[in-house]
Amino acid sequence: MTVLLKGKLYPFSSFYIKAGEGGTPTTSVVEYYTEGTIPFIKIEDLSCKYLTNNKDFITELGMQKSSAWLIPSKSVIYSNGATIGAISINEYPVCTKQGILGIVPNTNINVEYLYLLMSSSYFSKEISRIITEGTMKTAYLKDINHIKCPLPSMAQQKNITNLTSSIEEKLSIEQELLRFLN
């Protein structure tokens, strides 16, 4: 990231087409949940790089009667409240509860690069500077939007993500070997 930071930096707001928090439909209204088919993401679902399954669902009516919105697949799902920084890339369209942002990447942004950027120590440090403490810690999107971030070309973004994928794969193999030897 250090090499990237020597180039021009852009506000985070230029990295996405759409971004926003979700919302939780009123839990006492059973019609918002019973036989729901829309994946409803909570913080515990953000435990892996790729969001490939979840346990909670809401109905179309539940989505309409709350501030939840349908986040398209291949977006970044980022916790900006309470457990700030939990992050995944969704493999299918989802809705989220409040305190979790859906970030739909701009056309010049590789979702894998956006994931790496938002997972970086640089981004975490910048987030820690803007956290508002009230009832719970929150990093508001209006403040996140001002974080300056490196934006390499699409080809460079792909090179970066390919390199990190190779490193992650090698680490995974090494960890598996260590488990086997122990």
PLM region spans:
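Non-catalytic DNA-recognition/assembly elements of restriction-modification systems
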Residues: 1-23, 48, 146, 150-158, ...
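Generic alpha-helical structural signal
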Residues: 13, 72, 112, 158-161, ...
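A generic structural signal for alpha-helix starts
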Residues: 7, 108-109, 122, 154-155, ...
